[in-house]
């Protein structure tokens, strides 16, 4: 039989209620939210949406290999309209570690950055990781607490969930799967292509102002300045997805 059921509702409130109703009847259901055009890039609300979307994607991936019964995904019209990378690419990006794994911290750091994680001195929030000698802390959007991996040389010696505030261990794990901290995973060539497309689009838009034939208005000057900042903003945030061919 089938493993998934997709239900599309007219708005978020109905979608969330449907998930709650399904849980009441012991049916596995998860809500997949749409991006909020206004708040998606804001730290607090944007991270919440990102977390929900990534948790849903990870549940779908896990269910395909280990789940029994039917997983119901509930979303809205806006939710199914969002463009995503193929699920196979998302699966390929997942890193699974256990006590037989060997890790070179800086190579892992490069992979984590490509997966959307932000390197910090100390992990405080989801989407961050930190490396201090042979200690690697990772806080995935799909987890409720960060994970600390301790190395003996390059071998995994300990995998534990820990509390952010107290730094105390919560639970010892036998293995740990690191899911991407972004919905968009690109190769280096795709990123370069995306940046090139952004620059081309910026130049085309600036030409529309026809600077040589008429005096620019205040609004045109402001728009031009904003366009010139676009490339720098994209490089800073990694928001290439709209401009890539994937």
Each predicted region: which residue ranges?
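ASCE RecA-like P-loop NTPase motor cores
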Residues: 1-246
């Amino acid at each position: 039989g089938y493993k998934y059921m997709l239900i599309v509702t007219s708005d978020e409130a109905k979608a969330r209620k449907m998930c709650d109703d399904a849980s009441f009847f012991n049916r596995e259901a998860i809500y997949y939210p749409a991006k909020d055009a206004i708040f998606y890039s804001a730290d607090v609300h944007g991270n919440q949406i990102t977390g929900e979307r990534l948790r849903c994607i990870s549940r779908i991936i896990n269910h395909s290999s280990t789940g029994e019964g039917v997983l119901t995904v509930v979303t809205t019209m806006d939710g199914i309209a969002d463009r995503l990378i193929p699920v196979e690419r998302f699966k390929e990006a997942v890193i699974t570690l256990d006590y037989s794994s060997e890790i070179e911290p800086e190579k892992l750091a490069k992979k984590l950055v490509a997966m959307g994680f932000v390197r910090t001195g100390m992990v405080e929030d989801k989407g961050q990781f930190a490396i201090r000698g042979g200690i690697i802390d990772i806080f995935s959007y799909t987890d409720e607490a960060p994970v600390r991996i301790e190395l003996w040389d390059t071998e995994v010696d300990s995998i534990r969930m820990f509390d952010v505030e107290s730094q105390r261990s919560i639970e010892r794990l036998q293995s740990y799967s690191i899911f991407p901290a972004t919905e968009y995973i690109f190769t280096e060539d795709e990123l370069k292509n995306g940046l090139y497309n952004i620059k081309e689009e910026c130049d085309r838009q600036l030409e529309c102002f026809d600077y040589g034939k008429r005096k620019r208005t205040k609004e045109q000057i402001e728009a031009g300045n904003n366009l010139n900042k676009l490339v720098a903003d994209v490089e800073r945030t990694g928001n290439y997805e709209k401009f890539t061919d994937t």
